[in-house]
């Protein structure tokens, strides 16, 4: 099993291209199942979750072509199966996103209950109750969600909780429903706006994406299209925090500052100089970061996917901070690993108090989920000595060649296959 070895190595400096957003690419890949013609998606990151999704589409019968220019073409016409098997679904929660498209396009779907990061229950009830409101018959048996409907019928759906994947699933299903669907209490994330753009390019009629009320006028069929997914705002934020922690000066290209305003505000509060351009963000940190309080909430508030990274920064910041997680339970699993590096953190329920220390010290640590693993990488960049991070397959699910990108900025980081290669 691969590991990452880091040695604290001073400020990060240089330029970096940001990858396409995994959380935009995954629903767009699922949306290709709705079409009657091939769909081409561009700016797709090379990640484990993307590979798993492509395997799932192929298992369903779709023809998948991958080129060397971050492009993927999916031809859904040969799809012959509506069963998403456990072997693929168990590793990735986003696989539930094929439920709506398969049901809407083929009249039935069987999707194994999903797996993924162990950061809370993330119930699929929002997906199921919404599809039932659209006229689907749904049962859950033998670990599978089984759904059937001759044709879905548009209706008004008030979502019981704000759910990104729930909004995406219902949005996709409603594009082929008969009549108008209104989604209320919908999630507002940029990745949902991007999915709506993709669906609209395929012929869907959607308004209100990016607000809490989305209206979809169902159409008889969707055609082929080409769509480029948005930049990854979480990858962007992660590298910005890395620069802030190391006292660096980096410029990120092919990104969008408008997608992470709450993160940029917190970085400025921490003392960073942030300059934005049309598709660039430059950050310079000339001092030890100031501790900043963080409270996660649905977009446009501070994202839960940046909580662990800011906790890592607060570990070496000047002063004390309070980090509050309101989205998921069990999302402080990185705390004990940061403590192994010398962090002063007291976590209780959904709140953690972080007291900044002068320095962290390297140690063996273990990643528990995607963003927790990112926080350990950030901590390793500033820790004295060597930090060895185990179970980095979590990291590979969401960050494209992170060791190569950080190395290009001057970090001392490398991937190793086993600890025996470290002397």
UniProtKB/Swiss-Prot annotation:
It is found in: Cytoplasm. SUPFAM superfamilies: EPT/RTPC-like. GO terms for molecular function: UDP-N-acetylglucosamine 1-carboxyvinyltransferase activity. UDP-N-acetyl-alpha-D-glucosamine binds at residues 93, 305, 327. It comes from Acidithiobacillus ferrooxidans (strain ATCC 23270 / DSM 14882 / CIP 104768 / NCIMB 8455) (Ferrobacillus ferrooxidans (strain ATCC 23270)). GO terms for cellular component: cytoplasm. This is UDP-N-acetylglucosamine 1-carboxyvinyltransferase. It catalyses: phosphoenolpyruvate + UDP-N-acetyl-alpha-D-glucosamine = UDP-N-acetyl-3-O-(1-carboxyvinyl)-alpha-D-glucosamine + phosphate.
